[in-house]
């Protein structure tokens, strides 16, 4: 009985430590696109299916990074960083890209530009990308 209890305790500890490491790995992956000089102070988010996000790490500068891997119209590996002020534009991009058809996405972007509903980027902001067939 003591062996079973010890085994279960060990399994719980290992499981808990694995879960605790997952956010760190997500943060590290998202930060791959960030310039080294901005990396330590960057905010890291994780996009949700409803185009809102959870903050994985609060930063001290204006840079925000996130993983786009697995999202429609993205490379097999895709991470991106930009200004916090651009998050509404990113959310709009994600909504348009969710249909998974580049031609339809472009048509939606063009229509939003034409009718004035396209979210403007922060003037002078930069977008950093790291993407490709694998990490």
Regions found by a protein language model. Name each.
Residues 1-4:
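Positively charged n-region of N-terminal signal peptides that target proteins for export
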Residues 21-135:
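Primary mode marks residue(s) on the alpha4-beta5-alpha5 output face of response regulator receiver
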């Amino acid at each position: 009985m003591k062996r079973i209890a010890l085994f279960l305790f060990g399994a719980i500890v290992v499981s808990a430590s694995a879960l605790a490491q997952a956010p760190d790995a997500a943060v590290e992956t998202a930060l791959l696109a960030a310039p080294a000089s901005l990396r330590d102070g960057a905010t890291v988010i994780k996009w949700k299916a409803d185009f809102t996000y959870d903050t994985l790490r609060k930063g001290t500068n204006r840079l925000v990074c996130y993983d786009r891997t697995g999202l429609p119209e993205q490379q097999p590996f895709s991470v991106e960083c930009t200004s916090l002020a651009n998050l509404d534009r990113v959310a709009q991009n994600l909504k348009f890209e969710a249909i998974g058809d580049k031609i339809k996405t472009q048509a939606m972007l063009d229509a939003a530009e034409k009718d004035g509903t396209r979210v403007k980027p922060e003037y002078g902001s930069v977008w950093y990308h790291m993407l490709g067939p694998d990490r």
